[in-house]
Amino acid sequence: MPRLSFLLLGAFCMTTFVTPAIANTDTRAALESVAHLDNYQVVELRRYDIAPGQRDRFVRYFDAYFPEAFEQLDCMVFGQFEDRAAPTKFVWLRGYHDINARPIADAAFYYGPVWREHRVKVNALFPGASDNVLLLHPLAPQTGIPVLPAVDPVDEPHGARGVVVAQIFAVKKGDEDAFAQRAQAAFAHYEGVKVHPTGVLVTLDVPNNFPQLPVRTDGPFLVWLGVVENDAALKDFEASASQVEHALAGTGMLRGAPERLVLDPTPRSRLRWWPAAEAKSSP
């Protein structure tokens, strides 16, 4: 399948979390502390089926052991979430600097000491296959997922807050570029809604270079990500989201109805409604 052009969203306006002109000293320091954690050009959107009644337990294991373990291998856990619509679903986003870094980091983790110590307990919590995985990359350089500072247990004693929304569009082969253009115009309607856009990603059409972890081959897909502050903001946003989905479904370029995930960040998810983000602006 052809790769969606990096050029199509050159003018795409992503609402930023915070700009230097308005950031206070603490905010600038926090952003500078993660400035080296950027340029992740390969992203996995991973969805797991957890055993009934075991998701809270799985979340505690994941939050406690895995984010830093991946970061030490030079990859990134952008965020991890509970799917509101399905009490057995766990969703997370993992990033790599490039496709060649993926098998190196995965081998180091899955054959390394952290996973070897905890895999029996963790695997018991999702006994089914974990192959609902989209291999993606940013549609344009400015539409990658931002790396936010880690949750601060002092300033954020209740953990990550906000609601993450993912819109997933199954695009017909051959219509990738045309659909991206239409999506660009449609997503512009979110500019008047209190939402932080946090990424536009598309299928990465390359062989799976770590076959021990399957990825889906039924693409292409386009994925939009955003964060709202709370349920009230989510309600306001969902009206706009429905309009966008209806408009894009009407293009005739999709293989099925758009899918929308409403995701609650786990306590330690980096991708969240970050307090400093409330002083946001658009470039």
Where are these regions (language model features)?
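Positively charged n-region of N-terminal signal peptides that target proteins for export
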Residues: M1-L4
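An amphipathic, aromatic/His-enriched active-site/gating alpha helix that lines ligand/cofactor pockets
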Residues: N24-D38, R60-G79, A86, G95-L139, ...
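Compositionally biased P/S/T/G-rich terminal and signal peptide-adjacent segments
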Residues: D26-N39, H137-G159, G199, A276-S281
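Surface-exposed interaction/gating patches
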Residues: L45-P52, R57, A140-P211, R216-E229, ...
